[in-house]
Amino acid sequence: MDNIEIEQAEFENTDVPNSKSNLYCFQFSYLYGDEIYLPYSIGILWAYARTIPEINNNIKNKSFVILRENPNDIVSRLEEPKIAAFSTYVWNWEMSVSVARIIKERYPKCLVIFGGPQVPNADRLGDFFEKYPFIDITVHGEGEITFSEILLEYVNDQKFQAIPGLSYRGFTTELRPRTRDLNIFPSPYLTGVFDELFALPYQYHAVWETNRGCPYGCTFCDWGSLIAQKIFLFDEERLIKEMEYFAHKKIAHVYMGDANFGILDRDVGIASRIALINKNSGGFPKKVRVNYTKNSTDRVFQIANILNKQNLDKGITLSVQSMDPETLLTIKRSNLKYETLSAFIKRYQKEGIDTYTEVILGLPGETYKSFRDGIEALLEASAHDSLWIYRCSVLPNAPMNDLDYKTKHKIKTVKSPADLHHIEPGKDPIQEYDEMVVETATMQTKDYVRCQLLAWATQTFHALGLLRVLAIFTNQLNGIQYTTFYERLLEYAEQNPNTVLGKEYLKTKEKINQAITKGKSWFNIVPEFNNQTWSLEEASYLRIMLQLQAFFAEQDGFFNYLSKTEGFVFEQKILADFLKYQKAIIVKYENGKTEEFQIGCAINSFHRNMMIGKKKKLQYGNYHITITDPYNFNGDKNRYSTEILFWGRRGGKTFYQMCKETPIEQEHTDQLKPAPK
């Protein structure tokens, strides 16, 4: 296929007079059970194009192709394709090019068009057309008008070089200005574009735009740029009708495609209408996933409160990315001040609104120390069960992929299989890849591994909760930093490889090393819990749950090590009480039952206060604890892992919520004693 040569004007636009040329629109997505996204990106392109009579009279969209299947099988079902249009991103690039390659082999005169964020900008194309000779046209930036003009030229003279916003066989045309009036583009939802898909046996999710553009220019992101920093709006009347459509079609999950929802005053009103539609429709859509703006704190709080009261939002994401000033300067990002962020988190927790704090590991400018200090600051700000740490990957059109930027910051990447969680392993016919940052001028690969291990420990044992109560205990009563606690845990694990913890540590460390040195996959499989892929921390959590008794039996050894390294003596009765409570509060997959026991201090209220940012002194005395298990998993590991980890992680469901603490009259005066100097 490397020698494909097709002369201009030789794309067949018809075989029979007065017949229509067949167009196929591809936007591949992952199937989660029976759930999949409607192809909004390419759907809105066709919704606009078909309003032009000359296109509608001469071109027929035969089908939207969205399922990831064997590429040969996909192409074998096509009927004389004359145009194949692909909407691409990091999760479907390899699938798209595999299908496009076969289409061109079997139908050499088919016009193949690629667009979407994964298509390199014109100034970054390089040898793109040599590498992908089966692609005829690439669309850069916003695609609706460019796509329609391509179809018009296909019908007529095929003078594609005259169309702004594309590259054609190495020739790049002038940049197309962004469309200011987005309402000229019909909604693919409201115009019936997706009607054919509802005949298929799937539950659909939807992407929803209320505006386009991002005023920020973070170097790791391809959302904002010099040409996309102004925000343009869709009309509110259209938006309300689309939300009513989602309710009518029983769309369970809506993902908002806005970069900064909450940045505009009108967004509060839009949120109110979403909540009202959900209330009046019997609960649809069930959830709305929002990318909130990072600076409009009061407005965002209003919106989150509205959605939370209707049980619509999965929680608010605080995308800090880094807490280090130098790193933020390097990636051209500004954050809320720490005091404001801390108050923000506590405000949401007080109102019962879940927060998720996101950090990116591997950003240029970050060091091991700054990464560690950032994690410490976030945990001190009470982001205890909400910390999500993502690996930095380089996107084709992000400023971080600029050659000068990569050279300046000595960015080294590794191509590794895309880290996609909660999908059935081995079922996907084509592997997708990420360009993962593993080294920068300020962080060598060995320090990157240390950061990965600290991230793993913090997320497994703190965010997911296996040792969170104990870490809070040592922090508040001994002054031991959270990150020190987890660094010591990693040391202990390495020194004790035959323990449950040690084995899990070695397994994780090997996985990290294989991924960053050999480009192996990051995903994990735990056969006892669902046939699906899990992140590092989720897999460790599940494996430890299989050996929970042994894991907690080993904690005396770890606390002896911690006592020696940090110079504290832990009063054994208090430590035993915290261990008992920590083990009991974790949701388990065994038969549901009520657990009751007595302890010598008010651990439950102490822990609950800490989770919402209230630092109160631990009260001593005798307390009766009653923990009720409402789940009754009865050993059903599949249901357990789905409800508690897959669905429930964002809601902090790894801990039982029905915990009653009742004081008993007898006093308990044991105190924590500092180690002798």
Regions found by a protein language model. Name each.
Residues M1-F28, D34, E54-N61, S76-E80, ...:
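Radical SAM enzyme core and accessory elements
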Residues D2-L23, F160-I163, S167-V207:
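N-terminal [4Fe-4S]-dependent radical SAM core
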Residues S21, S187-K350, L361:
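Radical SAM [4Fe-4S] cluster-binding motif and immediate context
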Residues Y32-L45:
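Glycine- and acidic-residue-enriched helix-capping/strand-helix junction motifs
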Residues E54, P108-K109, P133, L312, ...:
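Proline-centered flexible-loop/turn and helix-kink motifs
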Residues N58-L175:
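Glycine-rich beta-alpha loop elements in corrinoid/cobalamin-binding modules
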Residues I83-A85, I240, Y245-G257, S281-G283, ...:
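Conserved C-terminal portion of the radical SAM core fold
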